[in-house]
């Protein structure tokens, strides 16, 4: 194994240990081939199945990339006229005064300025477009928007138009316990639990997938919607999702986003992507440890999976996320041989 590959895997194992995760997986694709694959640990912090190819991790908020593709379809098919349409043009069930001036672009780039109290009431944190803040409310609103536009859940569109053509068997919004599912650890001293939701409508944080299928999801984007020579998703849909859609902020530290994806323009203090990662790369992350990095310049897809809630580093977590992407990008900059390594 190339020393740089081993160095990256050692780093993944170190963070797994430091953050009290019981599981880790790495899949790297370059030039449409799996060149590195690694699995370690077990499905929970008690007696559990060993992690392997068929282990399905909860990817938490990395599910945004799936919702993003569905909204890309809605734009492509003219269900939405423009990203700059006010969300109130479509959804009338929200306080129009609070939502005033809030566009679909704002919701898709975390610049909407909305937040939610414990009692479910919505308030404005800052004027739409003036800043950036990661809040979960936009995911719910966009999920509702898709159902309003199509009269069915976005998960159905993905199953029919994307998952079936790709041959996905292990990507699902899980509603029942299964031995294939990796449990999530909230606290090291407590038993890990299944992260389920009663429905597969996309509203819950119950999307599970294997490291391989997550990598293939990234590779579909890398190849602009093509899979094995077939155009599965229109190229324009992918381009909408993975090119910068956020507006310029007065605060230069704030990250750039496509449709939810972090997109590398130049190094930003509050971005999850490291400064050494080439321009045009994009990344999605979940708070249970899944990370998907796509580097078009190197025709590279990197997947890293954990099963511990909250990424390592506490308030300094962005440093470790950037460090991983820097290390991964550096390790695979030189075109790699097609031989696959598995530990």
Where are these regions (language model features)?
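Active-site helix/loop module of the DD-peptidase/beta-lactamase fold
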Residues: 7, 53, 58-61, 76-115, ...
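Short, conserved catalytic-motif segment at the N-terminal edge
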Residues: 2-57
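Flexible glycine/proline-enriched surface loops and loop-helix/loop-strand junctions
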Residues: 51-54, 123-128, 138-140, 195-203
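Structured C-terminal helix/loop/strand segments within mature extracytoplasmic catalytic/sensor domains
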Residues: 281-343
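Active-site SXXK
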Residues: 12, 26, 32, 55-83, ...
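Active-site-proximal alpha-helical segments within enzyme catalytic domains
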Residues: 141-145, 205-227, 290-306
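Active-site Gly/Thr loop motif
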Residues: 182-205, 243-301
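Active-site-proximal binding-pocket segments
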Residues: 174, 179-183, 191-231, 241
């Amino acid at each position: 194994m190339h020393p740089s590959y081993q160095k990256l895997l050692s780093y993944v194992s170190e963070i797994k240990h430091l953050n009290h995760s019981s599981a880790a997986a790495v899949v790297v694709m370059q030039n449409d081939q799996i060149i590195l694959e690694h699995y370690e640990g077990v499905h929970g912090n008690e007696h559990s199945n060993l992690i392997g190819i068929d282990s399905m991790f909860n990817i938490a908020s990395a599910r945004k990339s799936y919702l993003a593709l569905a909204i890309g379809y809605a734009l492509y098919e003219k269900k939405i006229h423009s990203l700059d349409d006010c969300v109130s043009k479509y959804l009338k069930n929200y306080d129009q005064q609070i939502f005033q001036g809030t566009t679909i672009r704002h919701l898709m780039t975390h610049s909407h300025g909305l937040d939610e109290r414990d009692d479910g009431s919505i308030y404005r944190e800052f004027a739409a477009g003036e800043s950036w803040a990661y809040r979960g409310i936009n995911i719910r609103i966009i999920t509702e928007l898709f159902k309003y536009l199509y009269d069915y859940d976005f998960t159905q569109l993905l199953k029919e138009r994307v998952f079936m053509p790709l041959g996905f068997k292990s990507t699902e919004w899980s509603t029942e316990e299964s031995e294939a599912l990796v449990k999530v650890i909230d606290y090291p001293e407590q038993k890990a639990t299944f992260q389920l939701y009663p429905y597969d409508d996309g509203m819950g944080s119950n999307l599970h997938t294997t490291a391989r299928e997550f990598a293939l999801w990234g590779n579909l984007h890398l190849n602009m919607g093509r899979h094995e020579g077939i155009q599965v998703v229109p190229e324009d849909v992918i381009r909408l999702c993975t090119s910068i859609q956020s507006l310029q902020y007065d605060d230069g530290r704030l990250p750039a986003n496509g449709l939810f994806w972090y997109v590398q323009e130049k190094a930003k203090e509050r971005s999850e992507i490291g400064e050494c990662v080439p321009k045009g790369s994009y990344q999605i992350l979940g708070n249970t440890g899944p990370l998907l990095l796509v580097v078009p310049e190197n025709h590279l897809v990197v997947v890293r999976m954990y099963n511990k809630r909250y990424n390592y580093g506490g308030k300094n977590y962005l440093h470790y996320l950037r460090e991983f992407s820097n290390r991964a990008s550096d390790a695979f900059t030189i075109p790699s041989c097609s031989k696959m390594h598995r530990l």
